[in-house]
């Protein structure tokens, strides 16, 4: 025997995806310090610093605005007597005196002119609600509304009875060419054609698209072993390995390079205020300072002395008429004085008033004298005693602004104001200059795993290996994907005609052919028995939205529906944007209602209210009277296609068809034999890192690094908050007076001063110039009552009073036509800002971000000496951001730090995106009906809204009362034959049925029944139009009723008609369906 050739066995199963965890690699060198992080948020404001020394007084500011009017000063001494003034205007009418004795009737006066229309009175208190008015007469019917938009498609109605087959329609017009049909079944191979002459060689064509992969040919003879294939593609990435064992202790690392300066620490808390220092020596006299800024507005000065008397002002415009004051109580009746003579001399200076005399007893009433003629106007009497202050008149128009007063002296410095709120953080200062390099920072935490690196360049092709030993046939591989279609080859010479091949396997089932012509109509089946009424079917699927129907004719206006119920509360609106801080809140809630007012007068009927919401549908009405016969309806749509008729006889053989298109590529043949294995693939990319192994023991301490370079000066910290005021230091010695400072800039106008105190008594004024006419004097004594004049003419009608209360609602008007859907309202104003919600629970930690691409290793810096901290430099202007430095080599893994303290609460997050609307809230309880407001005018009809979405099918309504009996229909065509029913069980003999057994296919039945076929057919024909197909309830048996006289019924027991293999017919007489 020849020695056995070692043949490679079949490919073994794939090894586990994940190998064991590798040993930890050596620690990498420490990475370079990362770039400086972004600036943190502004720190808290520092505490307030100590108060600065007071600045020098500014220049005197411009005079402040005129202060509020001071209290009246004490009256000055009487001035010298002025010139005699012009006669004053007549005094206002005095209060009515007590009724005097009745005078003689005077001569009637002339009719007065009608008075001007009085001002509109204030509205009276609201009266009690009057009794409901009588119902108004029913309004006229409204005009028919415009047709509403078509309603949504109604739910599908119950299936109608099957219609009879329609009449055959006319031949349709020739249709356009249909779309390309699906590829036909693969045609049989045609006979080979004769060989064509070889054509001239064409230009090389462009590469065609790759053709579909052909069916595999029969397995060829095994070829010689091929050369080793090219190197295979990288294998799939291996699964993550298990964690490796704990690594050995690493060697002591070399001293790391000095790190960059660390980020600046946060500003320290302000230190405790130190004790006050001792008083310093008296300083030298300082140089003259710059003028200080304008001081704070001073407090108002004391009230100045009264100024000299000004010139009398011109008369101001008359104020508006004041409201009528309450009527004063009548004074006591004084004794009647004697009539003085009319004086003509100058008015003497007033004497000092004498003491009040006691009131004398009332004298007896004298007889009525006749009224004398009116005497001349007497001299102006002494001013009367000041009366009680009248009620406050309406506010007069503002007087002209006074002239600007002289600036008051600067007031004393006010008390310091309250501490202001913490200001908003100021803008970030410019970045300081870069600091010197700081000490090396600690090693950073290990970075995230980097992304896989890019694929390396392909290596050079290896030399061909020696020919390998042929392997055993491998297992059948899966069918390859279909290749692209190749370019067509050149036409070869025709081969010799081959011998006929063996019959092929049956081809795949072809697509369904076009529907055949309808078969001839079969004989009508026999009428079945009526089945029980089936249960209601499930609601059908929602149909596609129908096309918009044509606009219907205007319907007659419907009757008024009752007012609908208040709708449920709407869904909550979207959250409004956060509003600005609101103004102070509105006035408090309205106080409790007052006592009920007197009833007002009945108001006029209000305008008709807007149309109410549509009421719920009314209950089913009584059945209407039988309508007249309608016109014949239009020809109905074609009914559903009838059941397929029996297959017709085959037609004559048709002519040979054209050769079909080339058949589709056949199904893939059996897989070919396995090829030789290809050369080993390239090494796949490394699998993902395994879980980190447990930390190794700590390495030995590295050598101390050389002293770092002096770090750069950190940026100046923010100013601390104002410290608490220190205790006052001891008083310093008084300094020598400074030289007079330069005049400061004009201060801001001071605030309006407070009202001054009451001034001192003024000196006697100089003699004034002659005054203008005096104001009307106080009221004179009441005159005697004059005779009553004749009644004046009726004045013009007063202005229209305020509208009365709304009358009782009238009967509801007829329901107007429905308005079209209004456009959507504008978004409501944002609601008030809600209380701040409690902090939500901490969110779950986010998934780690994708690893960044590893950067190239940066060069290690030289070790510098450690510098001392320099003084804070001035803030430089912000430099441009430098490019991001290269990432350093990874540092050693640090020990796990302890848990840090909870960080400060973060800033409030930005407002999130608007969430989806919440679920509908539960309907609130129905609130009490509000008081009916006055009806507004009827708005114009809105434009028609777009039709709403199709509504869900409503629940089936209650069964209506039976309608009137319809006309008997015409005889319909015969229906298709029904399937033969299953045999029933034998039954008891029934009454009233005339059962004939029609044995059409057999010759056993007696002839007389055959003559009645037509009779039965016509009876069944007339019934088939009016009955649904009758089916037995469970397919095996049915209950039948025997009808006797008229429509009384007798229900028999379960029974069957006919034997299992018999056909039977029924002669149905008058039928009552129960």
From Swiss-Prot:
Keywords, sorted A to Z: Collagen, Disulfide bond, Extracellular matrix, Secreted
Compositional bias annotation for Pro residues: 1-13, 149-162, 685-697, 847-857, 974-986
Residue ranges occupied by any Fibrillar collagen NC1 domain in the UniProt entry: 1014-1074
UniProt-recorded Gene Ontology molecular function terms: extracellular matrix structural constituent
Subcellular location field: Secreted, Extracellular space, Extracellular matrix
Annotated spans, Disordered: 1-1010
Superkingdom as given in the UniProt entry: Eukaryota
One cellular-component annotation, GO: collagen trimer
Low complexity bias locations: 14-36, 129-147, 182-225, 234-272, 290-299, 377-392, 469-530, 563-578, 611-647, 661-683, 715-742, 803-823, 871-890, 920-956
Compositionally biased tracts (Gly residues): 163-181, 301-313, 588-597
Keyword Signal recorded: no
InterPro entries xref list: Collagen, Collagen_superfamily, Fib_collagen_C
UniProt feature, compositional bias: Basic and acidic residues: 45-59, 893-907
Family label: Belongs to the fibrillar collagen family.
Protein name: Collagen, type I, alpha 1a
Provenance organism: Epinephelus marginatus
């Amino acid at each position: 025997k020849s020695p056995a050739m070692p043949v490679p066995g079949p490919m073994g199963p794939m090894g586990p995806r994940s190998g064991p965890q590798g040993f930890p690699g050596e620690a990498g060198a420490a990475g370079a310090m990362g770039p400086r992080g972004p600036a943190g948020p502004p720190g808290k404001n520092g505490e307030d610093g100590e108060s600065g020394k007071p600045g020098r007084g500014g220049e005197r500011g411009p005079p402040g605005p005129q202060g509020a009017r001071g209290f009246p000063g004490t009256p000055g001494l009487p001035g010298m007597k002025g010139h005699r003034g012009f006669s004053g205007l007549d005094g206002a009418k005095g209060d009515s005196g007590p009724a005097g004795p009745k005078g003689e009737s005077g001569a009637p006066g002339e009719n007065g002119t009608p008075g001007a229309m009085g001002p509109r009175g204030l509205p009276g208190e609201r009266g009690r609600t009057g009794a409901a008015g009588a119902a108004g007469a029913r309004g006229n019917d409204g005009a028919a509304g415009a047709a509403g938009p078509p309603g949504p498609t109604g739910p599908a109605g119950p299936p109608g009875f099957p219609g009879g087959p329609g009449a055959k329609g006319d031949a349709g017009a020739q249709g356009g060419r249909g779309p390309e049909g699906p590829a036909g079944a693969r045609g049989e191979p045609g006979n080979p054609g004769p060989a064509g002459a070889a054509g001239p060689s064409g230009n090389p064509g462009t590469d065609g698209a790759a053709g579909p992969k052909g069916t595999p040919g029969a397995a060829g003879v095994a070829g010689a072993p091929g050369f080793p294939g090219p190197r295979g593609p990288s294998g799939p990435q291996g699964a993550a390995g298990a964690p490796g064992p704990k690594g050995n202790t690493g060697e002591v690392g070399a001293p790391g390079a000095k790190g960059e300066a660390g980020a600046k620490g946060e500003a320290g808390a302000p230190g405790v205020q130190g004790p006050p220092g001792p008083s310093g020596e008296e300083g030298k006299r300082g140089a003259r300072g710059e003028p200080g800024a304008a001081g704070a507005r001073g407090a108002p000065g004391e009230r100045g002395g009264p100024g000299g008397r000004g010139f009398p002002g011109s008369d101001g415009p008359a104020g508006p008429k004041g409201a009528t004051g309450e009527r004063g109580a009548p004074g006591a009746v004084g004794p009647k004085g004697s009539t003085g003579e009319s004086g003509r001399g100058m008015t003497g200076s007033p004497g000092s008033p004498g003491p009040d005399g006691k009131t004398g007893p009332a004298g007896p009433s004298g007889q009525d004298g006749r009224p004398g003629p009116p005497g001349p106007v007497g001299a102006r009497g002494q001013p009367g005693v000041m009366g009680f202050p009248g009620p406050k008149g309406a506010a007069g128009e503002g007087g002209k602004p006074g002239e600007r007063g002289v600036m008051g002296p600067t007031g004393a410095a006010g008390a310091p104001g309250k501490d202001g709120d913490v200001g908003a953080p100021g803008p970030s200062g410019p970045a300081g200059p870069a600091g010197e390099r700081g000490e090396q920072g600690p090693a950073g935490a290990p970075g995230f795993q980097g992304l896989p690196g890019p694929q390396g360049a392909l290596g050079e092709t290896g030399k061909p290996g020696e020919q390998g030993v042929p392997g055993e046939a491998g297992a059948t591989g899966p069918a390859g994907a279909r290749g692209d279609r190749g370019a067509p080859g050149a036409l070869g010479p025709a081969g010799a005609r081959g011998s006929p091949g063996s019959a092929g396997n049956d081809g795949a089932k072809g697509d369904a052919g076009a529907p055949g012509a309808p078969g001839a109509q079969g004989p009508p089946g026999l009428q079945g028995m009526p089945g029980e009424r089936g249960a209601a079917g499930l609601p059908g699927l929602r149909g596609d939205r129908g096309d918009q129907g044509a606009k219907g004719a205007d319907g007659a206006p419907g009757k008024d529906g009752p007012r609908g119920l208040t709708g449920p509360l709407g869904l909550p609106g979207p959250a409004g944007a956060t509003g600005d801080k609101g103004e102070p809140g509105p006035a408090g809630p309205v106080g409790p209602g007052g006592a009920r007012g007197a009833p007002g007068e009945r108001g006029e009927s209000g305008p008709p209210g807007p149309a109410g919401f549509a009421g719920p549908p009314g209950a089913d009405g009584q059945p209407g009277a039988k309508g007249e016969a309608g016109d014949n309806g239009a020809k109905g749509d074609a009914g559903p296609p009838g059941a397929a008729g029996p297959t017709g006889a085959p037609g004559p053989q048709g002519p040979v068809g054209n050769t079909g298109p080339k058949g589709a590529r056949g199904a893939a043949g059996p897989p070919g034999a396995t090829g030789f294995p290809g050369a080993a693939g390239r090494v796949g990319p490394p699998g993902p890192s395994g879980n980190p192994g447990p930390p190794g023991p700590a390495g030995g301490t590295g050598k101390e690094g050389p002293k770092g370079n002096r770090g750069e000066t950190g940026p100046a910290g923010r100013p601390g908050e104002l410290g608490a005021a220190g205790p006052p230091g001891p008083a310093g010695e008084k300094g020598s007076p400074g030289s007079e400072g330069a005049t400061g800039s004009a201060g801001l106008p001071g605030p309006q001063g407070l009202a001054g105190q009451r001034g001192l008594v003024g000196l006697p004024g100089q003699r004034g110039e002659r005054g203008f006419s005096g104001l009307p004097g106080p009221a004179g004594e009441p005159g005697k009552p004059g005779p009553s004049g004749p009644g004046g003419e009726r004045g013009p009608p007063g202005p229209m009073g305020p509208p009365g209360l709304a009358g009782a609602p009238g009967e509801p008007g007829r329901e107007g036509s429905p308005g079209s859907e209004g456009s959507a309202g504008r978004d409501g104003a944002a609601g008030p800002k809600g209380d701040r919600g409690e902090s939500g629970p901490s969110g779950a930690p986010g998934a780690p971000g994708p690893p960044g691409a590893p950067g190239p290793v940066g060069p290690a810096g030289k070790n510098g000496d450690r510098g001392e901290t320099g003084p804070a430099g001035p803030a430089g202007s912000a430099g441009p951001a430098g490019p991001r430095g290269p990432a350093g080599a990874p540092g050693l893994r640090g020990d796990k730090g302890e848990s840090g303290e909870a960080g400060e609460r973060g800033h409030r997050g930005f407002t999130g995106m608007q969430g989806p609307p919440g679920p509908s809230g539960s309907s609130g309880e129905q609130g009490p009906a509000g008081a009916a407001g006055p009806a507004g005018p009827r708005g114009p009809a809105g434009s028609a809204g777009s039709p709403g979405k199709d509504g869900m099918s409503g629940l089936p309504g209650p069964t209506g009362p039976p309608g009137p009996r319809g006309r008997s229909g015409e005889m319909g065509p015969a229906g298709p034959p029904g399937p033969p029913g299953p045999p029933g069980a034998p039954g008891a003999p029934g009454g009233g049925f005339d059962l004939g057994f029609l044995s059409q296919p057999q010759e056993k039945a007696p002839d007389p029944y055959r003559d009645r076929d037509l009779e039965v057919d016509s009876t069944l024909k007339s019934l088939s139009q009016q009955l649904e197909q009758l089916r037995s309830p469970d397919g095996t048996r049915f209950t039948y009723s025997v009808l006797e006289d008229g429509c009384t019924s007798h229900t028999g027991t379960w029974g069957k008609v006919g034997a299992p293999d018999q056909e039977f017919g029924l002669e149905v007489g008058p039928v009552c369906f129960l």
